Amino acid sequence: MAVTKELLQMDLYALLGIEEKAADKEVKKAYRQKALSCHPDKNPDNPRAAELFHQLSQALEVLTDAAARAAYDKVRKAKKQAAERTQRLDENRKKVKLDLEARERQAQAHGSEEEEESRSATTLEQEIARLREEGSRQLEEQQRLIQEQIRQDREQRLRGRTENTEGKGTPKLKLKWKCKKEDESQGGYSRDVLLRLLQKYGEVLNLVLSRKKAGNAIVEFATVRAAELAVRNEVGLADNPLKVSWLEGQPQSTVDPGPPGLSKGSVLSERDFESLVMMRMRQAAERQQLIAQMQQEDEGRPT
């Protein structure tokens, strides 16, 4: 950590958003949360992301080492006390204070506040140098955990896309519940209620409630995994259970392996890419056709 003067100007506790007496566990947790949000890999368009990430790393190194933290707290306390004293003084008293401190510095070779702060700063610099020589295992571990979490997030997004591209279309489920036609509450299942029940399993692309046939709806999920979880677990309201069944996109019990040209880590050819685009366009058209068909059937059904 090369820039000690800049470090002394920073409030490391405020930087991490923690209390001064926070334990090491709280310091590390705050570091992970802050570092994840400003990691350069996740903020390529932010020129200050790398600088802020470096400052957070410095704060972690100092605040998780007992000796370095004690030295930093001493400097911070001295600066805080000096700032509080200065704030209480008006302009005239500030001048008197400065004159008095000048005379005290001339009369005393040791013991002044400036010398105490200087000694504390020197101690802090020595502790930082020691940390740099020994290598901060804690910092390396926290940064490794951040990289691992970023990797897992990236893999999860890729898995969601793969589920959609490998299947015949986005998964759709049929929802049924008891509801009388004249029931304005729709049996307790408004659009907002259904979304709240279903979105916990994954992204919902579409939700269509039948206008003619009460107690019926179709939901379209972004991934097969989300649809599977909804079919397997959702029971709806206790006083009016919800029946969830497959309408389209139910996965096979066994899945055939993909063609060699589309193995993991390979790059799609131009023809493969065009086929994938056409498939997604067909899926969108089929989805709109299904919704229109359901609405048409509802309108044609006698009331």
From Swiss-Prot:
<keyword id="KW-0488">Methylation</keyword>
<dbReference type="InterPro" id="IPR035979">
    <property type="entry name" value="RBD_domain_sf"/>
</dbReference>
<keyword id="KW-0963">Cytoplasm</keyword>
<feature type="modified residue" description="N6-methyllysine">
    <location>
        <position position="264"/>
    </location>
</feature>
<feature type="domain" description="RRM">
    <location>
        <begin position="178"/>
        <end position="249"/>
    </location>
</feature>
<feature type="modified residue" description="Phosphoserine">
    <location>
        <position position="112"/>
    </location>
</feature>
<dbReference type="InterPro" id="IPR036869">
    <property type="entry name" value="J_dom_sf"/>
</dbReference>
<keyword id="KW-0597">Phosphoprotein</keyword>
<dbReference type="InterPro" id="IPR000504">
    <property type="entry name" value="RRM_dom"/>
</dbReference>
<feature type="compositionally biased region" description="Basic and acidic residues">
    <location>
        <begin position="150"/>
        <end position="166"/>
    </location>
</feature>
<dbReference type="InterPro" id="IPR034254">
    <property type="entry name" value="DNAJC17_RRM"/>
</dbReference>
<dbReference type="InterPro" id="IPR001623">
    <property type="entry name" value="DnaJ_domain"/>
</dbReference>
<keyword id="KW-0805">Transcription regulation</keyword>
<dbReference type="Pfam" id="PF00076">
    <property type="entry name" value="RRM_1"/>
</dbReference>
<feature type="region of interest" description="Disordered">
    <location>
        <begin position="150"/>
        <end position="170"/>
    </location>
</feature>
<dbReference type="GO" id="GO:0003723">
    <property type="term" value="F:RNA binding"/>
</dbReference>
<keyword id="KW-0804">Transcription</keyword>
<dbReference type="Pfam" id="PF00226">
    <property type="entry name" value="DnaJ"/>
</dbReference>
<feature type="region of interest" description="Disordered">
    <location>
        <begin position="104"/>
        <end position="123"/>
    </location>
</feature>
<dbReference type="GO" id="GO:0000122">
    <property type="term" value="P:negative regulation of transcription by RNA polymerase II"/>
</dbReference>
<dbReference type="InterPro" id="IPR012677">
    <property type="entry name" value="Nucleotide-bd_a/b_plait_sf"/>
</dbReference>
<keyword id="KW-0539">Nucleus</keyword>
<keyword id="KW-0694">RNA-binding</keyword>
<feature type="domain" description="J">
    <location>
        <begin position="11"/>
        <end position="76"/>
    </location>
</feature>
<protein>
    <recommendedName>
        <fullName>DnaJ homolog subfamily C member 17</fullName>
    </recommendedName>
</protein>
<dbReference type="GO" id="GO:0005634">
    <property type="term" value="C:nucleus"/>
</dbReference>
<dbReference type="GO" id="GO:0005737">
    <property type="term" value="C:cytoplasm"/>
</dbReference>
<comment type="function">
    <text>May negatively affect PAX8-induced thyroglobulin/TG transcription.</text>
</comment>
<dbReference type="InterPro" id="IPR052094">
    <property type="entry name" value="Pre-mRNA-splicing_ERAD"/>
</dbReference>
<keyword id="KW-0143">Chaperone</keyword>
